[in-house]
C-alpha cells in the first residue's frame, strides 16, 4: 500500500505514523536487553522502522512517531485520534490505513483499527482502509477487499529490502534485528509470495 500511495500521490504526500514505542516486544525480555533503558530500546526499534520506510521511499520528515510527540503517555490512542483528525482536516483527499479493528492477533493493532473505525463511523474521516494479516482475509467478503501487490521485480525488491532492515544485526550501529526476531514468521511468509 505504501508503494502504491507513493506512486499515486507522490513522496511528499505519504505519511506513516507509528503508534507504539515497541517496548512490549518479547525480545526485550531477553537477558541481553536487561540493562538497557526504555529510551535505548525505543531507539533500536525506531531505527529499524525508519530504515524500512526509507527503503520503501517514505521521506524521513513524513514518519511520525507518537512516542516522540508524547513521551509520557501510556495510552497513545487519543494522540492517534488527534493526528488522524489533523490529517483529515488539513490535507486534501486523505486515505487513512490502520490495522483491522477486529481481525488481528495483537490487541494494540485491534485498538488502532478501532480508533480509525470509530472516526469513520462518526463521519469524521472520509476514507479508511484496514491492513489485514493473510490468515484473516477470509473473513472479509471479496467485494470489500482492496489488495495491493507489487507490479514488478523493482517493487518486490523494495519490499524485500524493507523487510531485511528488520533483520540487520549490527550492534555497534544500534541495529539488533528486534523486528525480525520478534515476528520472523510474518516477514518469512510475506517474502515467500512473488506478488507480496
Language-model features: locations:
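Active-site beta-strand->loop->alpha-helix modules in alpha/beta enzyme cores, enriched
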Residues: 1-122
Amino acid at each position: 500500500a505504501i508503494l502504491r500511495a507513493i506512486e499515486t500521490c507522490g513522496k511528499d504526500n505519504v505519511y506513516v505514523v507509528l503508534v507504539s514505542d515497541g517496548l512490549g516486544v518479547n525480545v526485550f525480555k531477553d537477558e541481553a536487553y536487561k540493562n538497557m533503558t526504555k529510551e535505548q530500546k525505543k531507539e533500536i526499534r525506531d531505527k529499524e522502522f525508519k530504515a524500512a520506510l526509507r527503503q520503501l521511499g517514505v521521506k524521513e520528515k513524513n514518519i511520525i512517531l507518537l512516542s516522540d510527540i508524547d513521551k509520557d503517555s501510556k495510552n497513545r490512542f487519543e494522540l492517534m485520534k488527534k493526528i488522524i483528525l489533523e490529517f483529515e482536516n488539513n490535507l486534501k483527499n486523505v486515505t487513512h490505513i490502520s490495522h483491522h479493528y477486529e481481525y488481528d492477533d495483537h490487541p494494540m493493532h485491534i485498538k488502532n483499527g478501532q480508533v480509525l473505525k470509530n472516526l469513520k463511523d462518526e463521519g469524521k474521516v472520509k476514507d479508511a482502509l484496514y491492513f489485514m494479516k493473510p490468515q484473516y482475509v477470509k473473513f472479509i467478503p471479496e467485494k470489500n477487499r482492496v489488495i495491493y501487490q507489487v507490479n514488478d521485480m523493482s517493487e518486490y525488491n523494495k519490499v524485500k529490502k524493507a523487510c531485511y532492515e528488520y533483520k540487520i544485526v549490527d550492534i555497534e550501529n544500534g541495529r539488533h534485528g528486534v523486528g525480525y526476531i520478534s515476528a520472523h514468521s510474518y516477514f518469512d511468509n510475506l517474502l515467500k509470495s512473488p506478488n507480496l
